[in-house]
Amino acid sequence: MEEFKRNLELDRSQQHDFIYPLIFQEYIYALAHDRGLNRSIFLENTGYENKSSLLIVKRLITHLITQMYQQNHFLFSGNDSNQNKFLGYNTNLYSQMIFGGFAVVVEIPFYLRLLSFLEAKERVKSHNLRSIHSIFPFLEDKFSHLVYVLDILISHPIHLEIVIQTLRYWVKDASSLHLLRFFLHEYPIWNSLITPKKSSFSFSIRNQRFFLFLYNFHVCEYESIFVFLRNQSSHLRSISSETFLERISFYRKIELEVFTKDFKAIIWVFKEPFLHYVRYRGKAILASKGTSLLMNKWKYYLVNFWQCYFYMWSQPRRIHINQLSNHSLDFLGYLSTVRLKPLMVRSQMIENSFIIGNASKKFDTLMPITPMIGSLSKAKFCNVLGHPMSKPVWAALSDSDIIERFGRIYRNLSHYYSGSLKKMSLYRIKYILRLSCARTLARKHKSTVRAFLKRLGVGLLEEFFTEEEQVFYLTFAKASSNSGELYRRRVWYLDIICINDLANYE
């Protein structure tokens, strides 16, 4: 990153096209390739087929540069029947490398801006801010005191050109934007990369990083309204364009529609100091201490605002108003509830004593077992009832590879669901994976499960006892002799940057 700082000089006012040359640098694609191979894979390693792709990076870059200097560069035949070719090469392989390189390039200015922000705030551990688990301690602290919550399902995918226009306000590099527009328009399966799927979005596995970046960037843009409302709730006065994250035209639209009317009559609706908002991909939660009437006003305001100013078609039925006391939040693979915890207090006076019953609110996070079994069933580890099955497609692997794959799946699930209040659901998942592993090995060796386990011994169990569990018991076993208290111990980690594939059952 220091090399990027020296090359880019971090001065966009003097250098507006610093991103464009990076697209034709080989080390950018090598960096993207290494990121792809080193990412956390929960089910199986799918990167072996790409090990030789670095050998053709130079050929790809040379071809792109050659096309740029031709008069008919980037011209495609409209009646070309070969839809599996891209710039004369295989679509899957080259598009994966191109979009991987694009993802690295477009993330550079945003990452540098984040570093400057953290330096100004004297925060050096930026990686801690990326952890998904960091959301849940925030929910524990804030949501216990709130009343209503809005479950928001983000609108259907937007038009490609709107994404490009939104990106223009941050990346002032016309050449890069034109090249990006070309690749996205010419990519033959663009419409299948971002498609509505229940309450979330489905992305191409190969190009997931790049399209997640574009999607999250656009969503963050229309989330900037919360910055505006947060400032207005604390002081009713004119605000600078910086509050709108450099959206000058956006600021003018708001100024014409809002500030020219009776300002106080409109803004009082949003003077709510207890308003909290969290989002992950296609699902968001907006919680408040206000009344049901206030939440309804929030609901229809957001729908109209997103449709009018960001062309995000959203229907009111995609936003549900629920009361936290009798509603469970389905968010990030956890089932979160706010329950009343009874508490008896004994008050002693001079001659008399009183027992006072009191109840406090507590935010609980649980692992939903039914959707998790559904995910395991889709992956062919068990049937819909949760009965373990063998994995025939893995029977051709070696015994050590089979055991390692099953063990890796459980270790990742155990790591992700370490914050669950009750571990019984996790123990059931452990049982399913262990028996599925045993049946897969028995199927491979044409034996019964009982005979195979008797011959294998305890070696199979070691892969399913995670390092986190060992540290967990060594740390807390001495501090608490009550097994029930140890059973409900929750641990949040700061190194989880993506939701587990099996946990993403939406």
Swiss-Prot record:
Instruction: Supply the alphabetized keyword list.
Output: Chloroplast, mRNA processing, Plastid, RNA-binding, tRNA processing
Q: Does the keyword Chloroplast apply?
A: yes
Q: Name one GO biological process term.
A: mRNA processing
Q: Which InterPro entries match?
A: Domain_X, Maturase_MatK, Maturase_MatK_N
- UniProt-listed Pfam families: Intron_maturas2 (PF01348), MatK_N (PF01824)
GO terms of molecular function:
RNA binding
GO CC annotation: chloroplast
Entry's localization field: Plastid, Chloroplast
Highest taxon, organism lineage = Eukaryota
The residues that cross the membrane are none
Family, per entry:
Belongs to the intron maturase 2 family. MatK subfamily.
Q: What function does the entry list? A: Usually encoded in the trnK tRNA gene intron. Probably assists in splicing its own and other chloroplast group II introns.
What protein is this chain from? Maturase K
Native source species: Rhododendron hippophaeoides
